[in-house]
């Protein structure tokens, strides 16, 4: 159903962004083939696609991933990705700079495969550490290198300094 819905939305001029996962290796070759066929079928029907390989989840959490919680972590990563995209144009009390839809659309329309990095940190140099984590995210099979457009969403407490924001933005832009 996703390719049909995406095609209708895309044909109507609606910005379409797909966030999809590739199955865990232990789910088998047949499941991977199905996922890759689904991704191939969806690719030309969306403006941007973020592909999250479930096997890379072990690189983004300190907790031990058990079979019982693996799918829950995958769901949480998907929720975070969709939430981050929504926050770009929506309201969040911790977001420093909100973009308007035209900004997001200009970058994501007809962009193809997209890279999304998320970083968070606390303490001294938190903005720098979060930006470094975002640009070197081990979650995706893509890299920020060669990006033709970048959207930066910086959220933080009220004590986040202008220098911190500038440092974080520079790290992303120079990556």
Predicted region positions:
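Tubulin/FtsZ superfamily GTPase core signature
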Residues: 1-175
């Amino acid at each position: 159903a996703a390719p049909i819905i995406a095609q209708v939305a895309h044909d109507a001029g609606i910005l379409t962004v797909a966030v999809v996962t590739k199955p865990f290796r232990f789910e088998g070759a047949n499941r991977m083939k199905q996922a890759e066929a689904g991704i191939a079928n969806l690719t030309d029907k969306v403006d941007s696609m973020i592909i999250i390989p479930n096997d890379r989840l072990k690189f983004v959490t300190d907790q031990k991933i058990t079979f019982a919680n693996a799918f829950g972590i995958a769901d949480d990563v998907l929720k975070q990705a969709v939430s981050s995209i929504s926050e770009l144009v929506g309201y969040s009390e911790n977001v420093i700079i909100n973009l308007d839809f035209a900004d997001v659309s200009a970058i994501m329309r007809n962009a193809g495969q997209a890279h999304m990095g998320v970083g968070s940190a606390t303490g001294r140099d938190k903005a720098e550490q979060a930006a470094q984590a975002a640009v070197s995210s081990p979650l995706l099979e893509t890299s920020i290198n060669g990006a033709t457009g970048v959207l930066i969403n910086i959220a933080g407490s009220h004590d986040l300094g202008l220098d911190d924001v500038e440092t974080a933005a520079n790290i992303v832009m120079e990556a």
